[in-house]
Amino acid sequence: MEQSNIDLEGALRALCQRARTAARALAPLDRAQKDRALRAIAERLRAEAGEGKRSAVLAANAEDVAAARAAGVSEALVDRLVLDEARLAAIAGAVLEIAAASDPVGQVVGMERRPNGLLVGQVRVPLGVIAMIYESRPNVTVDAAVLCLKSGNAAILRGGKEAARSNAALGELISDALRSVGLPADAVQMVPSLDREATRILLGLTGMIDLAIPRGGEGLIRFVAENARVPVIQHYKGVNHLYADAGCDLEMACRLVENGKLQRPGVCNALECLLVHEDVAAPLLGRVAALSERGLELRGDAATCALVPSARKAAEDDYGREFLAPILAVRVVRSLDEAIEHIGRYGSMHTEVICTPRYDHAQRFLREVDASCVLVNASSRFNDGGELGLGAEIGISTTKLHAYGPMGLASLTTLKWIAYGEGQTR
C-alpha cells in the first residue's frame, strides 16, 4: 500500500474510533438531551436562512452551484444541489419535526412470561456508527445527522464533491450546535477526503462501521456494493411505474402522471414509466400527450407511437432508465399480468403505482409487485418519509435487510433481547 493510502487509512481509523467513542456517549442519552441538540441545530439553520447573503451556508452553496453549472452538470442535478432561504428554513422545520417525534430507543417489544418464569422480550437500541455515502443533495447532510443523533447513533458523512463546500459549512454548523449543548462534536463527522479511495477504505473498516448507507446514482451504489466489507443498505435508483388499468378514471390517471413526472423530475420517487391498458390507451395517451406543453417528452413502443405521433420510439434500455428529467417511457399492455411482468423485469423495487377502479386488481397488484412502496390510485411522490408519517428519512431502502422503503428513526435501531429472572438456571 502506498504511503499516502497508509496515511489516509490511519486518518479514517482515527475518525471511526472517535465516532465509536461518541456513539457510546450517545447511546444512554434520554430523549430530552437528544432533542435539545436537534433544536440547537434547527435554531442555527433558521438563523442562517435569515442571514440571506451573509449566510456562510448559502455562500458556500452558491460556490458549489456555480462550479456545478460551469462543469455542465444537468439542471435536474443542480436543482438537488441548490439551497436558498426557503429550503434552509424547510430543513430546519424538518429537524424540529424529528425532535417532536417519539424516540424509538428503549422501546420494549413483545415481553412475555416463559413457562420457567423468565420474562423475556426485546428492546430497541442504536446500531452504533453509521456511515452515510451520498451525492449532490446537501439537505441529506442534515437529515442523516439528526436522524442518527435522535436514534442514538454516531454519523460519518461522505457527501459528493459537487456539494463539498455546502456540506463542510453544514457540518461545522452541526458540530457547533452539539458543542453548545454539551454533546461530543465527534457524534457527526465529515470524511475529510473526497477521494474515492477514502470511501473504499472506509467501507473496509469492519468492526468500526456498523452500517453503511449509500444514497445516489447507479455508479455510486455499484461502487459501494463491490467494495463494502461492512453491512450495507442500498438506496437504489427509482425506476417507478404507473399502470393505468382498464376502466380507470382517465382524469385521475393523467393527474397522477403529471404529479409523478413533472412536479420534481429529478427526485428518486418521480415516475419514469407509464404502462397503459390497451382499452384506455387512446383516450389516456391523448391527455398525457398534451403535457408536452409543460415540456414532457414521451418515448413509447410501436402502439404508443401510433397513437401519439409526437412520441419518440423507445429504445430497449429506456424501460429500465431513471431519467431524472421530464422524459417518460410508455408501453401499451394487454393485461394486468403483462404490466406486472414488465415491472418485475424493469423495476428497481422502489415505488410502483396502479390506477384502477377494481378492488381485486388493486389487491393483486399490492400482493405481487415487489417494491418498497406500492400505491393504489395515488402519486408515486408519496413514497417519502414525511408523507408516510416518518418525518425526515435517511433514505429509501431498496434492499430488504433490515429495512425496506423509507428509513426513519426506527430503521436506525436494532432489537436486543432482554430477560428478567429470579435465579433460574437451565
From Swiss-Prot:
GO molecular function annotations of the record: glutamate-5-semialdehyde dehydrogenase activity; NADP binding
One biological process term in Gene Ontology: L-proline biosynthetic process
Entry keyword NADP: yes
Broad class of where this protein is predominantly found: cytoplasm
E.C. number: 1.2.1.41
Catalytic activity: L-glutamate 5-semialdehyde + phosphate + NADP(+) = L-glutamyl 5-phosphate + NADPH + H(+)
Pathway: Amino-acid biosynthesis; L-proline biosynthesis; L-glutamate 5-semialdehyde from L-glutamate: step 2/2
Family matches, as SUPFAM superfamilies: ALDH-like (SSF53720)
Alphabetized UniProt keyword annotations: Amino-acid biosynthesis, Cytoplasm, NADP, Oxidoreductase, Proline biosynthesis
CDD domains noted in UniProt: ALDH_F18-19_ProA-GPR
Gene Ontology cellular component annotations, sorted alphabetically: cytoplasm
Localisation: Cytoplasm
Record Pfam families: Aldedh (PF00171)
Gene3D superfamilies: Aldehyde Dehydrogenase, Chain A, domain 1 (3.40.605.10), Aldehyde Dehydrogenase, Chain A, domain 2 (3.40.309.10)
Broad enzyme group: oxidoreductase
InterPro entries xref list: Ald_DH/histidinol_DH, Ald_DH_C, Ald_DH_N, Aldehyde_DH_dom, G-glutamylP_reductase_CS, Glu-5-SA_DH, GPR_dom
PANTHER family in the record: DELTA-1-PYRROLINE-5-CARBOXYLATE SYNTHASE (PTHR11063:SF8), GLUTAMATE SEMIALDEHYDE DEHYDROGENASE (PTHR11063)
Family under the similarity heading: Belongs to the gamma-glutamyl phosphate reductase family.
Biological function: Catalyzes the NADPH-dependent reduction of L-glutamate 5-phosphate into L-glutamate 5-semialdehyde and phosphate. The product spontaneously undergoes cyclization to form 1-pyrroline-5-carboxylate.
UniProt name for this protein: Gamma-glutamyl phosphate reductase
Gene expressing this chain: proA
